[in-house]
Amino acid sequence: MNAILDKIDINSGYDIYKEIDEYETVIRNFFDKKIHPERFKSYRLIYGTYGVRHHEEGTHMQRIKIPGGFILSDQMKTIAELTRDYAASGHAHITTRQDIQLHYVALENIPALLRRLANVGITTREACGNSIRNITASYLSGINPNEIFDIVPYALYCTRYFLRHPLSSTLPRKFKISFSESDEDFAYAQMHDIGAIARIENGERGFKVYAGGGLGAVPMTANLLTEFINEADFFLLIESALRVFHKHGKAERENRNKARMKFFISRVGFEKFRELTFAELKLLKKTRNIGGDLKKYIEIFPLPAPTKNGRDDGLPNNKRISEPAIKEFIELRDNRYWDIFNEGLIEQRQKGYTALLIKPELGNLNPEELNILAEFSDNYGGGYALLTPAQNILIPWINNEFIYDAYNFLAERSFFKQVSGSTRDIVSCPGAFSCRLAVTHPYNLARDIGLNNEELGGLRIHISGCPNSCGQHHIGDIGLYGASIKSGGGIAPHYVVLLGGNIRIGKIGKVIGKIPARHAHNFIARTVELWNEEKNGNEQFHEFVDRLGFEPFRKILADYAVSNNTSDDLYKEPGFDENYKMEAESRGECAGSLLDLMAVNLFDSIRNIYEAQDDIKAGLINDAKRKCLESILLSSKMFVFLEGIEPETENDILSEFVNRIAAKNWLCNDWSNLKDIYYELKNSPGDKIDELFNYSKEFVYDCDKSFVRLQPNLKIQQCINN
């Protein structure tokens, strides 16, 4: 499997260890109070290091990107070791974006953790922050009988293409992309900024593309951008959409609450967005060619059947079935965990092979369980697994001759005790267990539901600790998110209830009311009972809700409303004896203010340099010249902000920079002649464009490196090269 890792190394061409060394230096500067806390926060978010609450000061959540959810068994073993060595929570958490999170990691241990991940080909870069987040893919790709083609290599290549990309690292907010191998759409195209579904037209591979979706506090379903675009142009189409957002989304950049592409599209209209995007694509195709690198990824997938599958001493199924008196076989069939195992078996399109879907409770696995699954994949699967948006794990390529041996491998290690309750069918974010924005503890509610409901009728239940939808409450059959209300002089924890979500058909759940947190499990129980009694045949839950209407469900909520509840339990969350206290923070891990203003200028400068390079290749010299000059002005203005001055004219910006900043030794190079050289290059003929480009690029690079050294007193630490 390491041969695969060598061929699809998403960090190829970059010194990932040098990046980690630089991050370690920044962490050390933070401990020594040589860097501003807000600047440090934006830096650590680039590497997926997130702040937490309810634990020792100095611990963080470390998010680990698993592109497409595709994880090798060796990588699982490494994450098991890291969980054991560094995560005070004691478990690794699978997220709804197919990431893995380690909670309560001491900040001083982060660099060592990242180096050990790098050793097995994993980077955490751009796992958080204003960037293209982990790119997700359908977990059944490669084995689905209905697939058009395997999309996992495209998700991996897309990660490689946009990782460290100037347009990705300079976004005003996060950006999400997904890939599905069929119209069954197990990766939920319509809830993403860009969602792709495999297509073949006239023998050519490509994608049906949706754009402008997203959940969060204001959910929107994506619209169809194109019925088909070929596989190579697809990646340029994404870049074109990003360029359009950067160029025309100034209003969204200035309002963080609306800095997602869905709000930009809503403002300008989808047809205008489509027009701008394809116009940008036409220009981009003149300078870009997606070819050999993509082909290298595609050639690896779909992965072939393992050459060795199953234990050497294992018995094939037909022998077990023909000799039922074998004690071990009888014990297997009588074991109460057999049904759980059997329920998770999924027939592959490859004859003679089966995949196993494992549902860990709330997506959490301890080090021992991770190692068991890694060993299981090596012994019985293909040496890899796929994480799912429902926080599950799929292990494909189990030879049908060794199904019972595979089961026994897990059963004799008591693995099924962790995945046996109804809680395993619930999707939940960690909530206030670790998140600073969360209002409630959804883990506790999920366990409360599991304790009080032996089965959930096959319903998909999604829980979030706040309106931001990390638990994807908008797309569940039943969705709940944390809230609070004032009642009788106290604050009562509640959950807002949504019904009928199904993003695979573009349907967002509808809010029907609130329920006290301690009684949310009662609503689930009575809804499941109603569902089991009243559903028609193969009716889906969203169809059931449409047929019955919301009133029967609102009547259930009314029985538990505050006005009908005088118990002290009203003020308690599930799992807590003490009364609820509102501790959520008003803003999360992406701060506003002066530093954001500076960062916007810097990011726009970087983007201009990147685009100017393409303009030069395309012969658009005037456009390239304008962007290079603008990048110098934006970066200059960024530092002048620190002096409390906001100059507007070209001359004032350059004068203030030269007079106030150039002499401070904040930057590594001498820029005392910046103003004179700027005007000289501005008035130079077009054949001097390369000189202007190189000068502006060097200046912006120096500014970027200096910004990292911003200290708590809002001064820049002197360049270490001086």
Model-derived features: where do they sit?
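Short, hydrophobic/amphipathic alpha-helical patches that form generic packing surfaces
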Residues: 243, 630-641
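Inward-facing hydrophobic residues that define packing positions of alpha-helical scaffold repeats
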Residues: 609, 616, 621, 628-629, ...
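Short, charged, amphipathic alpha-helical segments
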Residues: 622-629, 690-694
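Short, solvent-exposed positions on alpha-helices
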Residues: 539, 622-626, 648
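Charged, well-structured alpha/beta interaction segments
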Residues: 620-624, 640-643
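Long, charged low-complexity segments
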Residues: 593, 599-606, 610-614, 636-722
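Peripheral terminal and linker regions in Fe-S/redox and tRNA-modifying enzymes
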Residues: 1-613, 618, 722
